[in-house]
Curated annotation (Swiss-Prot):
One of its GO terms (biological process) is translation. It comes from Phenylobacterium zucineum (strain HLK1). Transmembrane segments: none annotated. Binds 16S rRNA, required for the assembly of 30S particles and may also be responsible for determining the conformation of the 16S rRNA at the A site. Signal peptide: none annotated. Keywords: Ribonucleoprotein, Ribosomal protein, RNA-binding, rRNA-binding. This is Small ribosomal subunit protein uS14. GO terms for cellular component: cytoplasm; small ribosomal subunit. Pfam families: Ribosomal_S14. One of its GO terms (molecular function) is structural constituent of ribosome.
Amino acid sequence: MAKKSAVNRNERVKKLVKQYAAKREALKAIANDESLPLEERFEARLKLAELPRNSAAVRIRNRCEVTGRPRAYYRKLKMSRVSLRELGSHGLIPGLVKSSW
């Protein structure tokens, strides 16, 4: 199991990302629009820099839903390889069959 503090921190980051997503997207659109004057684009970049760091989507860490493990994460299943193997061997994941050849 991952530390609860690390899992909770990641949840707080997810919440911040969701909260600032629209504002961040609007500022990025202004900053990248080459038809606007340079000063206006620069202002948008400054406002973007003033937003909280944790409001950027790249700060989110994919974590296992079962254990909170941050590494060896399968995106489709939202779990780590360890949890996948454990739950799969008990037959708790629908459609997952042990390979044999």
